[in-house]
């Protein structure tokens, strides 16, 4: 058993910033390797939208949340790459990183968590495609078949900690249809 700790930062925040965000403080506070209780711990940080790229990329990320799906996939990929049955998953997020964190947990609840073998066989794009299906009945049917063939049986998330969550992407009053697939409901698992 090991602990997988995923830390999703807010808009424009990155581990290399001069000022250290609270999410980065959480990431740095976790002892990687063998923890004090003898359990192996791994930490993965997902930088905030708008934290990298050219100025226009940073502005679009900050203003409209561009890059969020890339961050969700990066966090999900990290979990799939490192998860083994009985591992504990802890996910933290701040601001748009809270949205990212909830979406990652929603993706795990919706499509399941890929096994390492299925990840190696490039099924991550399939998982993302199914997660993006807007019709709930169609998504549920596709996800059930996908989970049975490519995912771990049951992957509970031990802890989801989010603070100052941003409730939406884009600009109020304009269409947000592209981002409506994100599952932000809290699962009983």
Regions found by a protein language model. Give the residues of each.
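Alpha-helical segment proximal to the catalytic Tyr-Lys
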Residues: 1-189
């Amino acid at each position: 058993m090991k602990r997988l700790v995923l830390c999703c930062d807010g808009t424009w925040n990155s581990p290399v910033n001069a000022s250290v965000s609270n999410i980065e403080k959480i990431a740095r506070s976790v002892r990687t390797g063998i923890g004090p209780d003898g359990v192996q711990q791994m930490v993965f940080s997902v930088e905030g939208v708008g934290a990298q790229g050219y100025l226009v990329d940073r502005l679009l990320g900050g203003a409209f949340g561009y890059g969020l799906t890339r961050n969700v996939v990066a966090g999900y990929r990290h979990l799939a790459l490192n998860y083994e049955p009985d591992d504990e998953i802890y996910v933290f997020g701040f601001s748009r990183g809270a949205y990212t964190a909830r979406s990652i947990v929603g993706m795990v609840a919706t499509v399941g968590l890929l096994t390492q073998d299925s990840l190696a066989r490039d099924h991550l794009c399939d998982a993302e495609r199914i997660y993006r299906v807007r019709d709930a009945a169609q998504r549920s049917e596709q996800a059930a078949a996908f989970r049975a063939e490519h995912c771990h049986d049951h992957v509970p998330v031990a802890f989801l900690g989010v603070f100052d969550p941003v409730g939406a992407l884009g600009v109020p009053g304009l269409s947000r249809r592209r981002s409506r697939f994100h599952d932000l409901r809290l699962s009983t698992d």
